[in-house]
């Protein structure tokens, strides 16, 4: 067999080099071995020394000053989570290891003097505390991050808290739970060492009954150490260019590898060291409930019946035989079973639908991804009793849904062929796909691969055979509840650069994803791995593509495989009940290292056999990542870039002027300078010059306000076009797109849909428009109009109308036709039959789709000219319009308005905001149904606004647009 037909590799791009360099290469090649022997590739491990001063960023504004707060005597609170569980809150203190060494009194003594320490934020990082306490300025503002020393990542820190033992614990066992420490933690309770923890994502669970005082204060102290390899951060500037991606931090494996700095985040000075997740006390008896595993199975294609299987690990932590009862309750179900445990024995109690008729659900409320149905959740309560005493309780939520997948594979018995499989139906606890032996398909230059199978896999028993005639070819397809899901994906590079991840802070971001019609979020390199992330994904209908903590395969890899696997195993066990998690992936843009790959695959097959483990985020049943910047010829999105499944595609995303002022000082707002570069304005890459030419095609920008306004026109269209390109080939080649990125980790100029402050600039509304569940669009280059229906419902007798308007608002062409629109499919309409020479110099093309009852379902506007970008200055000829806003009605928290253009001028790119009357500040987050819309003379548009519950009640609604400045409407 020829190498180009059957080439197996861990590193396709390296093998291509070998292919052209060698006359004969064996069919089965392990590229990593060859790299070690040939020295063809040196893995990236970051900077070896700091940049020179001239390459550092410099601004006109001084760093902001900070004033250290006086330390307060804050009492500890035990906040109840359940009747048997408390979060240890407040009262935490932070000091350096040097301060402890210099003290004459033991840190474990209640009399230890912490006057010169800091009131600590737990959960939180060291830097979060130091910024909160006024030691350092806000690192997100300007160049303030440069004022914070990198030595924070080279220091050990002590966390300390005093608390009283809960009265409810009398006669019971008390357990101490750490949900996450980065990177190492040495735990002491009342002077006695409890344990060491290592890795940011493993929990520490300890029986501390014998360590606690029944009366008086307990002292809990934790010595926290940063990652072993903090590396040297590259500082972005106009001279230094964009950030270098990671480096030595990747050696540490289970940590926040991006915190050393990337091309979208600066080096975080403490590398997110600290007790970054909460600490809890739990009381109970001798039997402890572990991490349950819930498997839901549908009798597809029938979705009216579901079987729920619940496996519950329980462990006897005593030296005595124990007898008891385990109960499980959720909506409409209440079951129990007896158990017996020998001393220190652990076993799994299984509630099987074969034995419990209650677990055979009729008409279950299914969990669906956003846009395909409601993300319904069930709420499970588990309780282990010993006699009449409750020994342990656990509450969690789960969803009834079934995941399956389509992809192409290669086997010796059968060449490249397409299959579908449902992991839960296989459920044999063994890996299926051999990612150490993958096969190049198609053009070798494109490096695309498909997996082979392990030799013990019975293909006929595992897979449904699909037709190779399906135009989606080798590409990955997700199914939920038997329905193909067209992936509209976003990416969290990191939830927050300082790991401030409260529900209050994070939930609006998920709400914005839902409103923009996303149905998947990629947890890039596992940087956002925490309970709240998955809980919000469950609640908002977001599938999760979950990476582990490794980046591209040209970067150094973890030193300690055992530590990596320990953290990964705990993550899988801990979060496997979340219906949102759709896929596990070992790393970003690469395969797991040899030696780790089989262990990781085996662990996932054992601990979570209901989900697909996908060996690589690019190339494997997918295309290459990118591009990442402005594409001046939008046709390329349709004719070249839109193909298959892409996990990374993005562009510049400039904030509004109001947002820019939140993180850049007035002195540095204009022109573009080092401060902009530090905040990810990549002026040397990603077609930056083309982007600037496009912005200035509306006329040279001479201020930050002009630049931001014109940039919104470009970013709206760019992000819309990249998605519409993929839309244009729905299920006829493309199966999904994951944007790089949808979420910013800090104030940024690129790779985001919304901005850090919850503002929704042009990029957001461009994405929201293109991802509408029912969407009408005009393709390039032929102007064909199509309807995209990414729902489970079909619609008959829909009317699609296209109209061409001059910049004066005069209609000069129109055409309508009726169409039946199938579910989860693309419907071709027509190409407008207007000759090029009949086009006005600059035209507003409006597509309008109505349902059979005349209700508008989708409106989509395009600016079209014979001269392309060169004609954008025509918009500057349009005079200022006059708008009127009328409140129609209120439905709960939703306010309904009618916006009307009462002038004879076009209103271009109209965006509404809410302004606090008292402070004059823009109120965020708020949720408008539309943004950057065009209003024809006399046109009315219905809009909705939803304000968060805590928002102000005395506000104005303001509007701004391309051809007018901000005005108060109401």
Language-model features: locations:
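Substrate-binding/catalytic cleft of secreted carbohydrate-active enzymes
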Residues: 454-457, 463-468, 520-684, 710, ...
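C-terminal segment of classical bacterial N-terminal signal peptides
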Residues: 22-30
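Secreted/periplasmic carbohydrate-active enzymes, especially glycoside hydrolases
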Residues: 1-17, 29-488, 493-496, 500-520, ...
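Extended, charge-rich helix/loop segments that form flexible
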Residues: 676-699
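Short glycine/proline- and acidic residue-enriched helix-loop micro-motifs
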Residues: 698-709
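Aromatic- and acidic-residue-enriched carbohydrate-binding clefts of CAZyme catalytic domains
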Residues: 141, 425-435, 439-441, 486-492, ...
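Short, conserved micro-motifs enriched in small and acidic residues
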Residues: 369-372, 709, 713
């Amino acid at each position: 067999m020829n190498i180009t037909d059957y080439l197996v590799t861990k590193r396709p791009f390296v093998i291509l080099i070998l292919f052209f360099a060698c006359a004969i290469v064996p069919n089965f090649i392990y590229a990593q071995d060859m790299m070690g022997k040939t020295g063809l590739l040196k893995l990236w491990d970051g900077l070896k020394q700091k940049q020179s001063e001239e390459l550092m960023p410099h601004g006109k504004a001084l760093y902001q000053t900070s004033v250290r707060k006086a330390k307060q005597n804050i009492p500890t609170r035990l906040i109840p989570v359940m009747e048997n569980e408390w979060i240890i809150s407040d009262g935490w203190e932070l000091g350096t290891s040097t301060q402890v060494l210099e003290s004459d009194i033991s840190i474990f003594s209640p009399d230890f003097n912490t006057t010169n320490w800091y009131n600590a934020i737990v959960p939180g990082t060291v830097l979060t505390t130091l910024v909160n306490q006024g030691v350092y300025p806000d690192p997100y503002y300007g160049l303030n991050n440069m004022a914070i020393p990198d030595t924070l990542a080279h220091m050990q820190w002590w966390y300390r808290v005093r608390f009283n033992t809960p009265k409810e614990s009398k006669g019971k066992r008390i357990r101490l739970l750490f949900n996450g420490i980065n990177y190492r933690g040495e735990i002491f309770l009342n002077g006695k060492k409890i344990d060491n923890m290592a890795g940011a994502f493993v929990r520490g669970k300890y029986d501390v009954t014998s360590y606690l005082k029944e009366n008086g204060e307990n002292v809990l102290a934790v010595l926290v150490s940063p990652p072993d390899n903090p590396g040297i951060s590259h500082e972005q500037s106009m001279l230094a260019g964009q950030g270098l991606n990671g480096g030595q931090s990747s050696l540490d494996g289970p940590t926040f590898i991006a915190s050393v700095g990337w091309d979208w985040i600066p080096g975080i000075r403490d590398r997110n060291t600290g007790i970054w997740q909460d600490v809890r006390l739990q009381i109970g008896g001798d039997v402890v409930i572990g991490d349950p595993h819930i498997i839901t199975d549908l009798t597809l294609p029938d979705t009216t019946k579901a079987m729920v299987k619940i496996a519950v690990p329980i462990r006897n932590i005593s030296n005595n035989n124990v007898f008891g009862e385990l109960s499980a309750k959720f909506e409409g179900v209440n079951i129990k079973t007896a158990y017996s445990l020998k001393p220190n024995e652990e076993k799994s109690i299984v509630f099987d639908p074969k034995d419990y008729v209650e677990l055979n659900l009729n008409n279950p409320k299914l969990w669906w991804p956003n846009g395909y149905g409601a993300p319904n959740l069930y709420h499970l309560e588990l309780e282990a009793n010993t006699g009449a005493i409750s020994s342990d309780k656990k509450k969690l939520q789960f969803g009834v849904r079934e995941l399956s997948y389509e992809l192409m594979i290669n086997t010796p018995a059968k060449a490249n062929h397409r299959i579908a499989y449902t992991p839960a139906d296989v459920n044999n606890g063994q890996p299926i796909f051999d990612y150490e032996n993958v096969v190049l398909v198609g053009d070798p230059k494109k490096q695309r691969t498909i997996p082979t199978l392990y030799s013990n896999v019975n293909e006929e028993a595992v897979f449904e055979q699909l037709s190779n005639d399906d135009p989606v070819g080798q590409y990955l397809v997700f199914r939920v509840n038997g329905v193909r899901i067209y992936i509209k994906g976003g990416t969290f590079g990191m939830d927050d650069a300082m790991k401030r991840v409260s529900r209050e802070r994070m939930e609006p971001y998920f709400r914005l994803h839902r409103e923009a019609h996303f149905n998947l979020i990629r947890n890039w390199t596992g940087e956002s791995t925490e309970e709240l992330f998955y809980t919000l994904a469950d609640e908002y209908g977001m599938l999760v593509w979950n990476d582990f903590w490794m980046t591209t395969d040209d970067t150094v890899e973890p030193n300690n495989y055992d530590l990596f696997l320990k953290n990964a195993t705990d993550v899988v066990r801990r979060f496997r009940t979340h219906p949102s998690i759709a896929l596990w992936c070992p790393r970003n843009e690469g395969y797991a290292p040899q030696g780790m790959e089989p262990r990781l695959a085996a662990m996932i097959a054992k601990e979570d056999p209901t989900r697909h483990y996908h060996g690589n985020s690019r190339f494997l049943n997918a295309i290459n990542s990118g591009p990442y910047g402005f594409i001046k010829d939008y046709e390329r999105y349709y004719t070249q870039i839109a193909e298959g499944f892409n996990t990374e595609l993005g562009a510049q995303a400039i904030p509004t002027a109001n947002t820019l002022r939140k993180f850049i000082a007035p002195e540095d707002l204009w022109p573009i300078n080092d401060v902009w570069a530090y905040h990810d304005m990549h002026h040397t890459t990603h077609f930056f010059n083309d982007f600037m030419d496009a912005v200035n095609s509306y006329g040279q920008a001479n201020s930050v306000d002009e630049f931001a306004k014109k940039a919104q026109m470009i970013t709206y269209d760019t992000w819309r076009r990249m998605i519409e390109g993929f839309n244009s080939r729905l299920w006829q080649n493309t199966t999904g797109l994951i944007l790089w990125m949808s979420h910013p980790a800090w104030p940024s100029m690129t790779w985001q849909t919304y901005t850090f402050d919850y503002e929704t600039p042009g990029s957001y509304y461009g994405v929201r428009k293109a991802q509408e569940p029912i969407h009408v669009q005009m393709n390039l280059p032929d102007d064909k109009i199509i309807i995209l229906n990414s729902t489970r419902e079909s619609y008959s007798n829909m009317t699609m109308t296209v109209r061409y308007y001059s910049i004066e608002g005069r209609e000069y062409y129109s055409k309508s036709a009726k169409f039946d629109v199938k579910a989860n499919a693309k419907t071709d309409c027509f190409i407008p039959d207007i000759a090029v020479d009949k086009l006005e110099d600059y035209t507003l093309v409006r597509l309008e789709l109505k349902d059979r009852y005349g209700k508008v379902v989708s409106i989509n506007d395009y600016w079209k000219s014979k001269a392309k970008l060169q004609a954008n200055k025509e918009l500057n000829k349009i005079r200022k319009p006059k708008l009127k806003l009328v409140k129609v009605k209120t439905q709960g928290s939703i306010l309904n308005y009618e916006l009307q253009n009462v002038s004879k001028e076009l209103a271009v790119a109209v965006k509404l905001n809410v302004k606090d009357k008292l402070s004059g500040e823009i109120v965020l987050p708020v949720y408008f149904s539309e943004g950057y819309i065009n209003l024809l003379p006399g046109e009315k548009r219905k809009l909705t606004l939803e304000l968060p519950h805590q928002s102000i009640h005395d506000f104005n609604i303001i509007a701004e647009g391309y051809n007018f400045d901000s005005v108060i409407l109401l």
